[in-house]
From Swiss-Prot:
Native species: Mus musculus (Mouse)
Function: Involved in membrane protein trafficking at the base of the ciliary organelle. Mediates recruitment onto plasma membrane of the BBSome complex which would constitute a coat complex required for sorting of specific membrane proteins to the primary cilia. Together with BBS1, is necessary for correct trafficking of PKD1 to primary cilia. Together with the BBSome complex and LTZL1, controls SMO ciliary trafficking and contributes to the sonic hedgehog (SHH) pathway regulation. May regulate cilia assembly and disassembly and subsequent ciliary signaling events such as the Wnt signaling cascade.
Molecular function (Gene Ontology), one example: phospholipid binding
Assembly description: Interacts with SEC61B, ARL6IP1, ARL6IP2, ARL6IP3, ARL6IP4 ARL6IP5 and ARL6IP6. Interacts (GTP-bound form) with the BBSome a complex that contains BBS1, BBS2, BBS4, BBS5, BBS7, BBS8/TTC8, BBS9 and BBIP10. Interacts (GTP-free form) with IFT27.
Signal sequence residues: none
Tissue specificity field: Most abundant in brain and kidney. Expressed in heart and eye. Isoform 2 is expressed only in the retina.
Family: Belongs to the small GTPase superfamily. Arf family.
Taxonomy, superkingdom: Eukaryota
PANTHER family the UniProt entry points to: ADP RIBOSYLATION FACTOR-RELATED
Keyword tags: Cell membrane, Cell projection, Cilium biogenesis/degradation, Cytoplasm, Cytoskeleton, GTP-binding, Lipoprotein, Magnesium, Membrane, Metal-binding, Myristate, Nucleotide-binding, Protein transport, Transport
Protein name: ADP-ribosylation factor-like protein 6
Length: 186
């Protein structure tokens, strides 16, 4: 199999691997989103909160994603910065039904955007306004306003309304992210 891998790489058939950081507060749906992006035969049936981080892989039409699913629990968020240097893209997940913690999500986003390993890089950021199926959720436009996303001028970003359990909105986001990554790589 190693020979076939090398041959496909030489012919340009091998998918480019990209490292993506999946960030957001605890219980926002990060692990559920990443699980749903994997092929159905590789998906976990039981999703448990991530402790520290986990590494997951999935493929799109032209890229191979290695995703660092980072715990969003308060005591683990300081670990995020150790992975910033190697991240080529960021998925930031927001629980759109949790208006009370939107302020905390904004604080964490601001900390991320101002970190020296992120601040001066044109790294694409995909925002999933998750849990749109819940009655108390706010629209992705409102999430964008609450997080002041329009103030992000030096990085490409996109926000998608999503329902991780049903998989709604996820493909739109991955397609956008893939386009952004390929634009940087070419």
């Amino acid at each position: 199999m190693g020979l076939l891998d090398r041959l496909s790489g030489l012919l340009g058939l091998k998918k480019k691997e990209v490292h993506v950081l999946c960030l957001g507060l605890d219980n926002s749906g990060k692990t559920t989103i990443i699980n749903k992006l994997k092929p159905s035969n590789a998906q976990s049936q039981d999703i448990v909160p991530t402790i520290g981080f986990s590494i997951e892989k999935f493929k799109s039409s032209s890229l191979s994603f290695t995703v660092f699913d980072m715990s969003g629990q308060g005591r683990y968020r300081n670990l995020w910065e150790h992975y910033y240097k190697d991240g080529q893209a960021i998925i930031f997940v927001i629980d759109s039904s949790d208006k009370l913690r939107m302020v905390v999500a904004k604080e964490e986003l601001d900390t991320l955007l101002n970190h020296p390993d992120i601040k001066h890089r044109r790294i694409p950021i995909l925002f999933f306004a998750n849990k749109m199926d819940l009655r108390d959720s706010v629209t992705s436009v409102k999430v964008s306003q609450l997080l002041c996303l329009e103030s992000i001028k030096d990085k490409p970003w996109h926000i998608c309304a999503s329902d991780a359990i049903k998989g709604e909105g996820l493909q739109e986001g991955v397609d956008w992210l893939q386009d952004q990554i390929q634009a940087v790589k070419t």
